[in-house]
């Protein structure tokens, strides 16, 4: 585990590390929770950052922008409205950024919520949570890769790699597991359970980002698991009306009582054992700005691993800010060509959804 003292020492040095350099970031799903905590840490550690924040309503987020601005008067904070579960909206937002910016140092994505066991679909036909946890993230990444690569090219060759542009997806990296899996399962109602959904979106993020890391070596790709954090995600899950949905009145009442008991018992315990939100923001900023190749080399010198060691360029990160080095679980998927298959599936979904929206056949 990377100590909090080391995290804070690194973050405190970001002002000097980025002196004379612009830092431009786009945050998706960061109007609260981990993403917002990371923004708060970033704007206090870098003098004049430019931060784009995607939100559902710029008017409703205006007060939060004002609060953030008070933390750093020199920060440029831009709220961008968008319904990110819709790929067409993702394209619109990306086009705004591409027109305004000549560089992008960090694409930070953390949208989503816990599955409630009942799929719901966007007007574009995608399962909503699958879109938030996977499809929209990959669409942002694909659209903004030219900007990320341009940033990499403008950096001087002798600059430290902690200034390499970075794609950062907060979900469940490092917790991939062996399971009967095909990419198409993401859209299957038959496989829509909480555990299956988490397992599938976790694996798809890892496979697709690893594929991109091989294709785009000038950009770092991170799939991170934040662990248990003191956000409202568990409370929202337990309080969701979907948790008590049933045709039978008695069963609906029993489920409602169970949720009340869980809220009374589980939530206090969760907040005791979970990581403070401020610390999570500190750790996520560290992971988004540290020299990951150097950390990879450092961890490689630690006691030997039993499995196959992951290669640098694509990093799965633990909530402790350590890189997941054991790559054994992914070997079977690679042998089956799953990274390429996941990528092909993703591109096919993009074409299908966006061609339908534009009226193409």
Curated annotation (Swiss-Prot):
Disulfide bonds: none
Classification via InterPro entries: NAD(P)-bd_dom_sf (IPR036291), Sec_Metab_Biosynth_Oxidored (IPR052228)
Primary subcellular site in the record, as a coarse category: membrane
Topology term for the membrane: Single-pass membrane protein
Signal peptide per UniProt: none
Cellular localization per UniProt: Membrane
TM regions (residue ranges): 257-277
Keyword match Oxidoreductase: yes
UniProt keyword terms in alphabetical order: Membrane, Oxidoreductase, Transmembrane, Transmembrane helix
Molecular function via GO: oxidoreductase activity
Phenotypic effect of disruption: Results in a significant reduction in leporin C and absence of detectable amounts of leporin B.
Record's GO cellular component terms: membrane
The protein's Enzyme Commission number: 1.-.-.-
Functional note: Oxidoreductase; part of the gene cluster 23 that mediates the biosynthesis of a family of 2-pyridones known as leporins. The hybrid PKS-NRPS synthetase lepA and the enoyl reductase lepG are responsible for fusion of phenylalanine with a hexaketide and subsequent release of the stable tetramic acid precursor, pre-leporin C. Because lepA lacks a designated enoylreductase (ER) domain, the required activity is provided the enoyl reductase lepG. It is possible that the dehydrogenase lepF also participates in production of pre-leporin C.
Family: Belongs to the NmrA-type oxidoreductase family.
Name this protein carries in UniProt: Oxidoreductase lepF
Species for this entry: Aspergillus flavus (strain ATCC 200026 / FGSC A1120 / IAM 13836 / NRRL 3357 / JCM 12722 / SRRC 167)
Organism phylogeny: Eukaryota, Fungi, Dikarya, Ascomycota, Pezizomycotina
Encoding gene per record: lepF
């Amino acid at each position: 585990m990377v100590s909090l003292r080391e995290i804070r020492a690194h973050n405190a040095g970001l002002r000097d590390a980025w002196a004379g350099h612009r830092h431009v970031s786009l945050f998706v799903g960061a109007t609260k929770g981990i993403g917002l905590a990371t923004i708060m840490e970033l704007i206090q550690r870098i003098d004049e950052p430019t931060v784009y924040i995607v939100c559902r309503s710029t008017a409703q987020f205006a007060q939060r922008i004002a609060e953030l601005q008070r933390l750093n008067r020199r920060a440029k904070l831009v709220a961008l409205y968008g319904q990110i579960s819709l790929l067409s909206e993702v394209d619109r937002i990306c086009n705004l950024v591409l027109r305004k910016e000549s560089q992008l140092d960090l694409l930070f994505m953390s949208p989503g919520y816990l599955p409630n066991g009942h799929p719901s679909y966007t007007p574009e036909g995608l399962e909503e949570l699958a879109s938030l946890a996977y499809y929209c993230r990959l669409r942002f990444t694909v659209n903004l890769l030219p900007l990320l690569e341009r940033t990499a090219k403008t950096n001087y060759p002798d600059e430290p790699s902690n200034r390499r542009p970075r794609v950062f997806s907060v979900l469940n990296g490092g917790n991939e597991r062996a399971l009967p899996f095909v990419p198409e399962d993401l859209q299957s109602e038959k496989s829509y359970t909480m555990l299956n959904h988490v397992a599938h979106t976790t694996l798809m993020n890892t496979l697709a980002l690893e594929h991109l890391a091989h294709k785009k070596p000038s950009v770092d790709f991170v799939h991170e698991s934040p662990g248990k954090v003191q956000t409202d995600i568990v409370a929202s899950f337990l309080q969701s009306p979907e948790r008590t949905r049933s045709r039978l009145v008695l069963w609906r009442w029993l489920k409602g009582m169970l949720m009340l008991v869980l809220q009374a018992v589980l939530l206090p315990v969760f907040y005791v054992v979970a990581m403070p939100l401020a610390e999570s923001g500190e750790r996520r900023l560290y992971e988004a700005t540290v020299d990951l190749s150097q950390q990879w080399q450092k961890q490689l010198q630690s006691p030997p691993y039993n499995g196959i060691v992951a290669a640098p360029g694509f990093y799965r990160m633990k909530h402790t800010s350590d890189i997941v080095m054991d790559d054994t679980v992914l070997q079977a998927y690679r042998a089956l060509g799953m990274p390429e298959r996941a990528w092909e599936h993703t591109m096919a979904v993009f074409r299908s959804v966006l061609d339908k929206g534009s009226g193409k056949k």
